Amino acid sequence: MKLQIILLISAFILLLSISHTEAFLGFLKNLFGKRALRDLNKYDYMSDPSFSAEDIKALRELFR
């Protein structure tokens, strides 16, 4: 009975460590990936047709 409990606890700890390691590696991958290094969402407002040229100019000044 003790062996079964020890095996269950060790399997649980192993699964937890694998899932946390995978999440940590995914975080590092996203942190240092090409898309993470460039902020691609910075100029999403430029594709909005409701903005005038003056609005875009004002937004560019704000983002400087």
Swiss-Prot record:
Gene Ontology biological process terms from the UniProt entry: regulation of defense response to virus
Function: Antimicrobial peptide.
Source domain of life: Eukaryota
Positions of the propeptide removed during maturation: 36-64
Free-text tissue specificity from the UniProt record: Expressed by the venom gland.
Note: inhibits hepatitis C virus (HCV) infection by inactivating infectious viral particles. However, it cannot suppress established infection because of the poor cellular uptake and restriction of endosomes.
Subcellular location: Secreted
GO cellular component, one term: extracellular region
Origin species: Chaerilus tryznai (Scorpion)
Family, similarity comment: Belongs to the non-disulfide-bridged peptide (NDBP) superfamily. Short antimicrobial peptide (group 4) family.
Signal peptide residue numbers: 1-23
Lineage summary: Eukaryota, Metazoa, Ecdysozoa, Arthropoda, Chelicerata
Listed name of the protein: Peptide Ctry2459
Modified residue annotations for Phenylalanine amide: F32
Keywords (A to Z) from UniProt: Amidation, Antimicrobial, Antiviral protein, Secreted, Signal
